From Swiss-Prot:
Component of the cytochrome c oxidase, the last enzyme in the mitochondrial electron transport chain which drives oxidative phosphorylation. The respiratory chain contains 3 multisubunit complexes succinate dehydrogenase (complex II, CII), ubiquinol-cytochrome c oxidoreductase (cytochrome b-c1 complex, complex III, CIII) and cytochrome c oxidase (complex IV, CIV), that cooperate to transfer electrons derived from NADH and succinate to molecular oxygen, creating an electrochemical gradient over the inner membrane that drives transmembrane transport and the ATP synthase. The chain crosses the membrane at residues 101-123. Belongs to the cytochrome c oxidase IV family. Keywords: Membrane, Mitochondrion, Mitochondrion inner membrane, Oxidoreductase, Transit peptide, Transmembrane, Transmembrane helix. It comes from Neurospora crassa (strain ATCC 24698 / 74-OR23-1A / CBS 708.71 / DSM 1257 / FGSC 987). This is Cytochrome c oxidase subunit 5, mitochondrial. Component of the cytochrome c oxidase (complex IV, CIV), a multisubunit enzyme composed of 11 subunits. The complex is composed of a catalytic core of 3 subunits Cox1, Cox2 and Cox3, encoded in the mitochondrial DNA, and 8 supernumerary subunits Cox4, Cox5a/Cox5, Cox6, Cox7, Cox8, Cox7a/Cox9, Cox6b/Cox12 and Cox6a/Cox13, which are encoded in the nuclear genome. The gene is cya-4.
Length: 171
């Protein structure tokens, strides 16, 4: 290959053109979507195959990129329904679901009460340290030991209950 200035310039231009990134631009569709396609979309949307749903949504999205005054009433209704309609996660609950939720909640609370009552019925009695007499004796022991003289039982002017928290054993 000859290395002339003309050939070098031609090769340079080809290399520069190849290095420039080109972006594909998709033009918004100017043709309205046919009425039979959009007719009764509220009832047909859930039964449509996913591919057909995606194609219809893309076509509507392309139409919405243009002037909204050019959209037909059917297209506006379909776009609104697809975007905000009661389908998918926004679907209305089936009839009777509230009663079912209430019934299961009541059953769960009742079952937890039965488990609690059963455990209380077969539990051991409270320990001896949970009597009022034992707790008063604990207070006297701590006073004799001069425990916590700054803020506790043996501090000046203390008038709290100390460790007493249970009813008397004779009660």
């Amino acid at each position: 290959m000859l290395r002339t200035p003309t050939v070098s310039a031609l090769v340079r231009n080809v290399a520069v053109r190849a290095a420039k990134p080109t972006m594909a631009v998709r033009a918004a569709s100017t043709m309205p979507i046919s009425n039979p396609t959009l007719a009764n979309i509220e009832k047909r949307w859930e039964q449509m195959p996913m591919q057909e749903q995606a194609e219809l949504w893309m076509a509507l999205r392309d139409r919405m990129k243009g002037n909204w005054a050019d959209l037909t009433l059917q297209e506006k209704k379909a776009a609104y329904y697809i975007a905000f309609g009661p389908h998918g996660p926004r679907a209305l609950p089936p009839p009777g679901e509230q009663k079912k939720v209430l019934a299961y909640t009541v059953a769960g609370v009742f079952l937890s009460f039965v488990i609690f009552a059963t455990m209380r019925a077969f539990a051991k009695p409270p320990p001896a340290t949970m009597t009022k007499e034992w707790q008063e004796a604990t207070n006297e022991f701590l006073k004799a030991q001069k425990s916590d003289p700054l803020t506790g039982l043996t501090s000046e002017g203390y008038n709290g209950k100390g460790h007493v928290q249970s009813p008397s054993a004779s009660a």
